[in-house]
Amino acid sequence: MEVEKEFITDEAKELLSKDKLIQQAYNEVKTSICSPIWPATSKTFTINNTEKNCNGVVPIKELCYTLLEDTYNWYREKPLDILKLEKKKGGPIDVYKEFIENSELKRVGMEFETGNISSAHRSMNKLLLGLKHGEIDLAIILMPIKQLAYYLTDRVTNFEELEPYFELTEGQPFIFIGFNAEAYNSNVPLIPKGSDGMSKRSIKKWKDKVENK
């Protein structure tokens, strides 16, 4: 997989230019999205382009999240206090990590968008709430670009579809990353849809980290 498009707000650019912990977070996320390969015996990511909507997207997300959890110690399903305690509505952040060096703390929340455009707007708004209320210091959304999304599950949103609304994040440290396959080939196997063909694994949930302190 490869990163093909990015939108980085000025606030995020400033943090990236001077903050080592934010740089580390950004590099870990980019490494994770570039890590998936397909087929499994390959060294690159090639997607089957036989017809529209012929591949699944969840296995791609899980390959990315496996690296974030197992190698970089990110956690899944981090609730925002503003949603859980005050508004009592809304789901947790997909993946979250606290970067600590000496007495400095940076909290990063990320969403890997596999839903439709409405889902993407919810993800963006959720992360904006986290930034506004001081619960995270950097927000990141990963999503396929339009070319790749055409061959993924029906109605999966894409970078270009959400792009007209990126300006809503200006004034906040926010990064959007659009990824693409390295090659297209009708002869490679289809990526299973949903969780089909995926081995079950135990995910690292934030609540388990908190409860085990």
Curated annotation (Swiss-Prot):
The keyword Nucleotide-binding does not apply. Keywords: Endonuclease, Hydrolase, Magnesium, Metal-binding, Nuclease, Restriction system. Its EC number is 3.1.21.4. It catalyses: Endonucleolytic cleavage of DNA to give specific double-stranded fragments with terminal 5'-phosphates. The active site is at E113 (proton acceptor). Its cofactor is Mg(2+). GO terms for molecular function: DNA binding; magnesium ion binding; type II site-specific deoxyribonuclease activity. It comes from the Bacteria. The protein sequnce was determined following expression in E.coli. This is Type II restriction enzyme BamHI. It comes from Bacillus amyloliquefaciens (Bacillus velezensis). The gene is bamHIR.
